[in-house]
Amino acid sequence: MPAAIETDSLTKSYGDTTALAGLDVSIPRGEVYGFLGPNGAGKTTTMRILTTLTTPSGGDAWVMGEHVTDRDAVVEHVGYLPETPPVYDELTAREQLTYLADLRDLDAAQRDRIDPLLERFGLADAANDPIRTYSKGMRQKAALAGTVLQDPDVIFLDEPTSGLDPRAARTVRDLVADLADEGRTVFLSTHILPVVEELADTVGMLANGRLVAEGAPADLKRRAEASAEAGLTGSDSASDPTERTLEDVFLSVTEDHAWHGKSAESEG
């Protein structure tokens, strides 16, 4: 069975600027993959390539076994929530989902998901109100409902809790956890590291278009602690590995590439 997401020496350049410099990942089906990196590291570029919105400059990528150059085959499997999700202020949540179903030419079974999704995402009582009247949290839930409307196998989320108040952010995190519990693959990019630490099975850390660390959150913490003890990383990190956070690891590996994961092979 092919991986849910796989890339092989994936590159992307914009003129003289390199956004991705040989990305290699293999993400099993049903996994939550936390994708971290500073601004400009290549996270959004990666997601846009994997959802067929951007053409790579080189290398290969597959989603559910379908090559990203086969757009029609890939989009059957994916849902994508960009950092600024498109919502239509003058439509109601129900109208927006119906519009998306028409746009994507969804079948009857997929259209039958509209009302259950409105209920599940806590929008049933406001389903017939214009989206312009919604709070930011409600707007994000409406956008997320649209992302999963076609019942995708792989869900790409770019900063899904950005700008939300704590209660709304918790609701969105719970919804993401529920989607993962259903066996979907979730590719999650966020700057809110506790969200990744809470939800992700595996974390990949990107810097300068390269994967500089990858592993389970607890494993990354142990490896960072071992490197700190060996004097390979900065001394500002936590002295007790049980107190080390994913933020400590992220700051360490993105500022100092003396230790890293899979990218060691690709960097040569």
Where are these regions (language model features)?
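ABC ATPase "signature
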Residues: E214-G215
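Conserved ABC ATPase "signature" region
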Residues: T98, D102-A126
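Conserved ABC transporter NBD signature motif
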Residues: G59-D70, V74
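Conserved catalytic motifs of ABC-family nucleotide-binding domains
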Residues: D151
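Catalytic Walker B motif of ABC-type/P-loop ATPase nucleotide-binding domains
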Residues: I155-E159
